[in-house]
Design a protein with these regions (language model features):
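Nucleotide/phosphate-binding catalytic cleft detector across ATP-hydrolyzing
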Residues: 1-155, 174-189, 209-308
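Ser/Thr-glycine-rich phosphate-binding loops at phosphate-binding pockets of nucleotides
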Residues: 160-166
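PRPP/pyrophosphate-binding module of the type I phosphoribosyltransferase fold
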Residues: 167-172
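A contiguous pocket-lining binding segment that forms or flanks enzyme active sites
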Residues: 197
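Short, basic interhelical loop/turn and adjoining N-cap
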Residues: 202-206
């Protein structure tokens, strides 16, 4: 079974299940409540506390355990009850700037483990990951709107994630990996700036969900003064990000500039208010990378079948 997963620094995303925070608590004894997965004699519970940013997600087992959660959720979502072990083909991705150096290691991180047994929701799972295909983030998201990009001689994809903002230049619909990078300008940096400013000026500890509510125009329960600080910091953050891209000789006032990722959805109002981008285009689906991985895998498989 093909399962696509986006291992974000802020959230893990799949096609059929709601995103969940990239955070785990490990225990030697079964904890009370929560989403608890049992693996190799240990108990893992999802938490809203993110794993600290890791450029290399293969340094320990935590992202593998998060992958087990994602696989179980996908199997449950499609009511897949095939013979054990379930053979799984993973489609995953990495930031374009890390892709060349890390793709082999990231694929090997999931492979050669044999049959993996774990329990979630009192159900025993046995899976065998027999294939891993890795693709560049941002390009994968762009694939979901490929028909609108293939006729464009130049398009810039900007993927604003949790810890990084990745960019990739497309020429006639093809990714140019010589013009890509990952900037440490993700929304986690914005959250930290806002929390510090609000704590200093309002003596208030603001939660990230409250920040999200303010930026998305929802009821946050916060004062106008706090909301003003949040919006002002967000506008400055967007201005700094776009200036950083311009300093890298990336043209934002001609050609298509495609914004994707949860951060782009969160900051859409600030991006549209900026005078540094002529006509921003937004991919609203925060699971666009996941869907792109699936499309790329399927296209690759058809190509192999046809002898390409």
């Amino acid at each position: 079974m093909l399962i696509s997963i986006d291992h974000g620094n802020k959230q893990v995303k799949t096609i059929h299940h709601a995103p969940f925070t990239s955070g785990l608590v490990c225990s030697e004894v079964r904890p009370f409540g929560g989403e608890t997965l049992t693996y190799q004699g240990k108990y893992y519970t999802l938490t809203d506390q993110r794993i600290p940013y890791r450029r290399d997600k293969t340094e320990d087992e935590r992202f593998f355990v998060l992958t087990l959660f994602a696989i179980a959720y996908e199997l449950e979502a499609v009511s897949f009850y095939g013979a054990a072990p379930v053979r799984v083909q993973l489609a995953v991705g990495l930031p374009p700037a890390h892709y060349g150096a890390q793709q082999k290691r990231f694929a090997e991180y999931f492979l050669n483990r044999g049959t993996v047994s774990f329990t979630l929701h009192d159900r025993q799972y046995e899976i065998l990951i027999d294939e891993v295909s890795c693709y560049p983030q941002s390009y994968a998201a762009a694939i979901t709107v490929f028909q609108t990009l293939q006729s464009s001689p130049r398009a810039l994809i900007i993927d604003i994630g949790g810890f990084t903002a990745d960019y990739l230049l497309l020429r006639n619909g093809e990714g140019d990996l010589s013009v890509c990078d990952s900037l440490e300008n993700g929304v986690i940096l914005l959250y930290n700036r806002i929390k510090s400013r609000v704590a200093a000026e309002q003596d208030l500890l603001l939660d990230e969900t409250e920040i999200d509510a303010i930026l998305l125009g929802r009821d946050s329960g916060q004062s106008d003064a706090v909301s003003q600080i949040v919006r002002q910091q967000a506008q400055e953050f967007v201005s700094d990000l776009l200036s950083s891209l311009r300093e890298r000789m990336l043209e934002l006032k001609s050609g298509k500039v495609i914004f994707t990722g949860g951060g782009a959805v969160l900051l859409r109002q600030q991006i549209e208010a900026s005078d540094k981008v002529r006509e921003p285009v937004f991919i609203e689906d925060i699971a666009a990378n996941v869907k792109g991985y699936q499309l790329l895998y399927q296209a690759e498989r058809i190509g192999r079948h046809n002898g390409y």
